[in-house]
């Protein structure tokens, strides 16, 4: 049914249009072999200049097209449901509404967070068997077990990341999931927005995807074995060291979750994958734009000074402390 057609959702406000552009151009560069790539952009207050630049960029690829979706009704819809804004904005929720609103001809749709670089072919996601599940996700590499208890999960339950979401669109529509999800949200509130929703509401209906399709940059920033141990990740609910290393040099999608020494798109960053973002930035209409400057704060200095055995434990302590406040 998919036959080389990839439908993709991106979402951002105007501040992150350039970051989205980096991700989009990396997607297009590494998937020129696909028959068609349809990009649906959910833009919150995108400026005309950004729209023109994105249109021009995507237009350089014969197998790609971009559609800017009218999301003007989304904020009011989300307020009516009663969901909690994320960092003052509702945009993180937009994709959850768009899944039912978009008219696509394939059985699946892929959401990609702008904080990513696509570094390989995504044929595997077009061919993936959902096995009756609603969506396919990868485990989250930054969520500690203590927080699972807050939202009613067990340490042995997987907590999935929503930075890359492969949606079984056929099932979403057939089972009228949009209406069921909205009703659930009217009676439940979540701290980590739609990601908590997916882990709770869709528990048992998520197919685990390999780490290569959502490879967190924490694996490049920290000693992997020490990181797994410090965070108490269990074999039943997280990837093994060997699984992570299998994709270490050949991930399909790299997700920027490590920013201690600057985000990879920021000027002056010392991020282990910053070179990749710079590579693809040069292929966008923003190649000469002045990017935000990375700030060398106390966390960056500690990261440079302290051994990994201490750093990973400090990280785990900080995250546990942060989410303990949500109890």
Predicted regions and their residues:
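Short loop->beta transition adjacent to catalytic acidic/histidine clusters or analogous donor-positioning motifs
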Residues: 31-40, 66
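Short internal beta-strands
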Residues: 37-45, 136-138
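Active-site-proximal specificity loops/subdomain of glycosyltransferases
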Residues: 57-100
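GT-A fold catalytic core of metal-dependent nucleotide-sugar glycosyltransferases
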Residues: 72-75, 91-143, 159, 166-167
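A short, conserved beta-to-alpha structural element at the edge of catalytic cores
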Residues: 135-154, 269-270
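Conserved nucleotide-sugar donor-binding
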Residues: 164-176
């Amino acid at each position: 049914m998919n036959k080389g057609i990839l439908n993709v959702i991106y979402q951002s406000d105007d501040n992150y249009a350039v970051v989205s552009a980096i991700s989009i151009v990396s997607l297009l560069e590494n998937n020129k072999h696909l028959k068609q790539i349809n990009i649906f952009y959910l833009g919150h207050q995108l400026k005309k200049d950004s729209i023109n630049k994105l249109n021009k960029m995507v237009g350089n690829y014969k197998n790609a097209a971009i559609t800017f979706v009218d999301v003007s009704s989304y904020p009011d819809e989300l307020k009516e449901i009663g969901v909690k804004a994320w960092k003052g904005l509702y945009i993180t929720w937009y994709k959850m509404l768009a899944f039912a609103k978009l008219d696509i001809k394939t059985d699946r749709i892929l959401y990609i967070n702008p904080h990513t670089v696509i570094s390989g072919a995504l044929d595997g996601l077009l061919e993936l068997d959902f096995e009756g599940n609603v969506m396919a996700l990868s485990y989250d590499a930054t969520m500690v077990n203590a927080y699972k208890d807050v939202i009613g999960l067990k340490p042995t339950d997987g907590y999935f990341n929503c930075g890359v979401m492969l949606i079984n669109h056929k099932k979403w529509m057939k089972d009228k999931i949009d209406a069921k999800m909205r009703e659930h949200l009217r009676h439940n509130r979540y701290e980590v927005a739609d990601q908590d929703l997916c882990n709770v509401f869709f528990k048992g209906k998520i197919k685990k995807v390999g780490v290569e399709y959502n490879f967190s940059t924490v694996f490049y920033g920290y000693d992997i074995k020490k990181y797994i141990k410090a965070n108490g990740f269990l074999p039943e609910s997280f990837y093994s060291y060997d699984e992570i290393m299998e994709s270490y040099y050949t991930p399909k999608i790299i997700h920027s979750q490590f920013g201690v020494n600057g985000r990879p798109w920021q000027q002056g960053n010392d991020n282990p994958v910053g070179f990749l973002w710079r590579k693809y930035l040069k292929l966008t209409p923003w190649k000469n734009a002045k990017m935000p400057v990375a700030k060398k704060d106390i966390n960056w200095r500690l990261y440079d000074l302290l051994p990994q055995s201490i750093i990973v434990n400090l990280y785990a302590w900080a995250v546990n402390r942060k989410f303990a406040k949500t109890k």
